[in-house]
């Protein structure tokens, strides 16, 4: 039993790493399925480029949209801002607003970057797309010293149907694949450098120590778990009370429940202040004596570490 708890705790502590690993495996598997089952390069000048680009960038765009859909931070920032724009940028705090949006974009870009990396390292989509370009620069790169036949047959190289000698066809295919893999590694290096710089900057400007930040993360995780449990329990009780009142044809019993303003406040992105020993908007709300509070009174300063409750 203790061993099971140890394993469970390990997976819980490493759930972010495990999540990214699973995402990477799914991305690689999806790319291989696309390449072997769905992708068939037309090998015509007019269709190679749009066809290859659609398979290269199309899934990345879809994954980006899905990333926004599943982003809790995005919906916390966006929900209700059309009716009340101050929710997004209270008191014109565009810096805090921009920080929040950048973090949303950062999280949403993980899956698309993984897809682009895997697709470029494989090279199939890139080979098809670039071979269909009728640009002088492309022709000069691939068909230098190979004559006009290479220019006319380049779009057929990915399919192996060109009239070029086999060794030239293989050489062109290797050149296309090498370019694709260079771009793939460039994407990886760029993403890693940006992630490193962002992490270093985030920790450098942190207003809390490392140990307090560790405690903060644990607290937010526990608060999130307890919130889900309490929400489920109270929703069940409220449903039971309403149904009992309906079927008994009696007035419902009094049921204490947070008002709209309370929900608005605890749903806001937390603003850290050194003068307050609070770790979430929920804690700040329950410990404040005066609860007639509007989130617009305080500018939104996005937490540097992006810890959030729900």
Swiss-Prot record:
Cellular localisation: Membrane
Protein name: Calcium homeostasis modulator protein 5
Keyword terms, alphabetized: Ion channel, Ion transport, Membrane, Transmembrane, Transmembrane helix, Transport
Recorded GO CC terms: plasma membrane
Annotated family: Belongs to the CALHM family.
Organism: Danio rerio
Membrane-spanning residues: 17-37, 49-69, 101-121, 181-201
One Pfam family named in its UniProt record: Ca_hom_mod
InterPro entries from the UniProt entry: CALHM
GO BP terms, alphabetized: ATP export
Record GO terms (molecular function): monoatomic cation channel activity
Topology with respect to the bilayer: Multi-pass membrane protein
Biological function: Pore-forming subunit of a voltage-gated ion channel.
């Amino acid at each position: 039993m203790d061993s099971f708890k140890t394993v469970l705790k390990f997976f819980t502590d490493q759930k972010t790493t495990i999540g990214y690993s699973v995402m990477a495996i799914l991305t690689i598997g999806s790319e291989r399925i696309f390449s072997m089952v769905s992708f068939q390069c037309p090998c015509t000048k007019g269709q190679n480029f749009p066809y290859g680009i659609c398979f290269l960038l199309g899934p990345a765009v879809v994954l980006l949209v899905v990333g926004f859909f599943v982003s809790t931070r995005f919906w916390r920032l966006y929900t209700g801002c059309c009716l009340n724009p101050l929710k997004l940028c209270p008191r014109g705090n565009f810096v805090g607003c921009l920080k929040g949006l950048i973090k949303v974009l950062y999280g949403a870009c993980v899956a698309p970057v993984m897809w682009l990396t895997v697709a470029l390292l494989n090279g199939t989509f890139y080979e098809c797309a670039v071979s269909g370009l009728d640009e002088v620069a492309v022709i000069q790169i691939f068909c230098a010293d190979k004559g006009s036949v290479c220019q006319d047959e380049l779009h057929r190289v990915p399919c192996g149907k060109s009239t070029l000698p086999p060794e030239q066809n293989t050489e062109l295919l290797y050149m296309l694949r090498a370019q694709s893999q260079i771009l793939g590694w460039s994407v990886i290096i760029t993403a890693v450098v940006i992630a490193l710089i962002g992490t270093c900057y985030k920790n450098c400007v942190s207003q809390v120590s490392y140990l307090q930040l560790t405690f903060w993360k644990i607290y937010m995780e526990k608060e999130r778990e307890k919130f889900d449990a309490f929400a489920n329990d109270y929703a069940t009780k409220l449903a039971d009370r309403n149904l009992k009142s309906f079927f008994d044809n009696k007035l419902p019993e009094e049921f204490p429940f947070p008002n709209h303003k309370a929900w608005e406040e605890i749903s806001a992105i937390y603003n850290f202040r050194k003068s307050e020993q609070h770790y979430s908007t929920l804690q700040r709300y329950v410990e404040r004596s005066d609860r007639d509070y509007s989130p617009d009174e305080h500018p939104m300063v996005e937490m540097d570490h992006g810890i959030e409750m729900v």
